[in-house]
């Protein structure tokens, strides 16, 4: 099992023990850290986060965990389903969203998946933002919402 945590996202082989592979608990942890960062830094008035994914066999499970976590953190989720990285990036700006998550491990083998994190401009997080997501996740310093978000398709 492999879990790689970097400023460009969280990627790994699906399954395994916490911290050793990309399993549902790790997905919740890093999605919650990302949601906390977005809540602190966005200048967009929207409460939406776009989620798109590739066709990997684990994609449906990862999408469900990510979307449920984002809603639990108080964000409205725009699930665009199967979508390329550029399509998801563009959807962030077209939806007026405060961020986006692309579920794809790109060139990695099929047993891998990843969370690629976008800002309100549909761009990958910069080094400082990526490091802050990792810091929040490590400290479990999440900021929870008073109200649950909704899902949009």
Model region roles, listed by residue range:
Residues 29, 33-36, 87-90, 132, ...:
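Alpha-helical scaffold segments in soluble metabolic enzymes
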Residues 13, 113-152:
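Gly/Ser/Thr-enriched, mixed-charge loops and adjacent short helices
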Residues 43-121:
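Ferredoxin-reductase
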Residues 32-34, 77-79, 106, 127-133, ...:
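Short, surface-exposed, polar/charged, turn-prone segments marking secondary-structure boundaries
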Residues 25, 86, 127-131:
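Generic alpha-helical secondary structure signal
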Residues 1-68, 72-73, 150:
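An N-terminal, well-structured beta->alpha segment
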């Amino acid at each position: 099992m492999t879990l790689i945590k970097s400023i460009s996202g969280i990627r790994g082989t699906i399954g395994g023990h916490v911290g050793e592979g990309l399993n549902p608990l790790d997905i919740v942890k890093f999605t919650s850290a990302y949601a906390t960062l977005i809540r602190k830094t966005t200048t967009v008035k929207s409460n939406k986060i776009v989620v798109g994914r590739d066709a990997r066999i684990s994609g449906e499970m990862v999408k469900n965990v990510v979307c449920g976590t984002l809603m639990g953190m108080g964000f409205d989720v725009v699930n665009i389903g199967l979508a390329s990285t550029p399509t998801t990036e563009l959807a962030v700006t077209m939806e007026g969203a405060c961020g986006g998550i692309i579920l794809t491990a790109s060139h990695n083998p099929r047993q891998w998946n990843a969370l690629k994190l976008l800002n309100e401009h549909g761009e990958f997080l910069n080094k400082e933002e990526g490091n802050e997501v990792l810091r929040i996740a490590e400290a479990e310093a999440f900021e929870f919402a008073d109200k649950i978000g909704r899902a949009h398709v």
